[in-house]
Amino acid sequence: MKKFTILKGIAAVIPDINIDTDAIIPKQFLKTIHRKGLGKSLFYNERYTEGYNKNLDFILNKDPWSNSSIIIAGENFGCGSSREHAPWALLDFGIQCIISNSFADIFFNNSVKNGLLLIKLNKNEIEILNELAMKKESFSVDLINQKISVKNNEINFNIDPIIKDRLIHGYDDIEITLKNKQLIVDYENNKNKFHIWKNIVNEKQ
């Protein structure tokens, strides 16, 4: 998985609330298990009018936001059904960070596991960033120091230290398991000491 330390780029504002996973990547594009190519169909119903004819009113079809690496989204982003294709499509398009007031839990977990940084900020901070994004200002997202810098503005953000470590080092689930292999082996070898009730049941039998 790609390491995330500092991201510099343009941010696109998509302010609608409750953008669900079907809006992010509609169900007809879920037949593949390949991550590459899904970015073309990201926000399909909003980006295109018919077939793949671009809707020029949609922000990701406008310059410079067509090259965005950051989205500033409305609250409860990623609600709806669980589909890992949603973060796949975002990443394949080039989005590496999403900033919002809140995210759906399942989407949040799927995103973290795929290396997509999700940042929660309060509404006032979101409004400040929205205004700067619409002015086409360049954003810097520093995960190591947990801060967003835009022009003369700096906003700090909180993140779970485990998630932070995972993203900075680019660990996927398999790499995390291998990293903790000895702890897992030790636990398996000693688990009966922790599960006393098993010993009691075995003695009664």
Regions found by a protein language model. Give the residues of each.
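Cytosolic catalytic domains that perform sulfur/thiol-centered chemistry
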Residues: 1-74, 78-79, 85-205
